[in-house]
């Protein structure tokens, strides 16, 4: 395909948001520019419930540090303009993610395998997958001792002691950051989880959102 002058592709929409697609994105965008992209938020094929996108592309005339192209979301027929930057691995929301990843590393998660972890068990819980009537979010709840194989729910363990009031403020701030992030990226920033355009967040990204929230709150206090 890399020898083509251009064409049309139909692929999973996670191509634009998944960290694991980094090398594929780099190879593609080092060679091609996208002309226009359609994103489908409903099931399009019988054999898969995953959301897909289609886009037309052409071979680059010159190497560039960023590309901008129109995106239409179906069936809503909403039109957006999307910019992807090379320095952020051509990833949707890459600039924002870089800021999040640069936050101090303060959190891990509580597991049955390590019920007495080094650090402080909090009441901060992350629900990592959108539900039908509830988006992925942070909440305050009793500690959940998860399995090593868990991917959807976790209680955070902090390297610093946090009052319950501070934990509640972190939850509120982190949820606002996630809401703003999804809005700014037209809800294309997190990877899709199976059907109905549901999104998911990995534990490491969740830790980073919580850490950035704490850092912003402490900066405000100072």
Question: Predicted segment positions?
Answer:
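A generic alpha-helix propensity feature with a strong bias for hydrophobic helices
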Residues: 15, 73, 78, 107, ...
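Flexible, glycine-/basic-rich loop-and-beta segments that form/coincide
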Residues: 49-112
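Extended accessory and catalytic-adjacent subdomains in large enzymes
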Residues: 42-50
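Short amphipathic alpha-helical surface micro-motifs
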Residues: 17-20, 34-39, 103-104, 108-109, ...
